[in-house]
Amino acid sequence: MFRLDNLLERWTEIYAPMQHNPSATAKPEEKAFFLIDRWADQNEFQRTFNLLHKPSLCYCTTIEAQIAPKANPKQIIYQYNWYLACKQRSTGNPLADDEGARNAKLDLNDMMIDLLAFLFTLKGYVRGRTLPKDCPDAVRDIADSLSAEDRQGIDGLRLDETQWWSAPVYKNGWWLLGVELEGLDPRQLCIVPTRYI
């Protein structure tokens, strides 16, 4: 199965504002990628956000899916959800709080656009387009290391239908941007004989 969470974690590692450290021994403040069940549930981000000083991506691991209508053979569409989070810059001036809140939301929107550009670039690459000449080496490395399963999964992402929205302030100046994206599972819906007795 295509794992979008693995691809997004790799993006957080190479994206300069985040620079996620994926090591199991990383300090909480070195992390910028978190797996969560749902935002409303207690999770690692919520337990450590007061130690964080950089934007983060919180990927929801709950599974939402449906059968693709009119697909023959039958396929499954998955709904992927995640949150981008960033802390409002403190000005020390309560009168500037509204401007700081606006800037935090605009920063999140810029990060989302950067992430979409990354995903669109990879989708074009798996469809045979060459990477842009000014494409960062880290993005090239990811593109060149994609497995066949990753390539099919990226090709099935419905990037043109991506939706995102800003949410009210979470806590202590942390703002959220919720994201929804659908993807067509490249596997056909069929019986796998080895899974039966």
Task: Specify the residue positions occupied by each region the protein language model found.
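Small/polar-rich, solvent-exposed N-terminal microdomains that initiate assembly or binding
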Residues: 1-72, 130-147, 151, 197
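Extracellular/virion structural assembly segments
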Residues: 2-6, 71-77, 85-128
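Acidic, low-complexity intrinsically disordered regions
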Residues: 7, 35, 78, 160-161, ...
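Short linear interaction motif-like sites in intrinsically disordered regions of transcription factors
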Residues: 12, 40, 83, 165-166, ...
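Sequence-level detector for tyrosine residue identity
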Residues: 15, 59, 78-83, 125, ...
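Oligomerization/assembly interface segments of phage tail-like spikes and tubes
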Residues: 74-91, 169-187
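Acidic-leaning, charged glycine-interspersed low-complexity segments
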Residues: 104-184
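Mixed-charge, glycine-accented linear interaction segment located at domain edges/termini
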Residues: 186-195
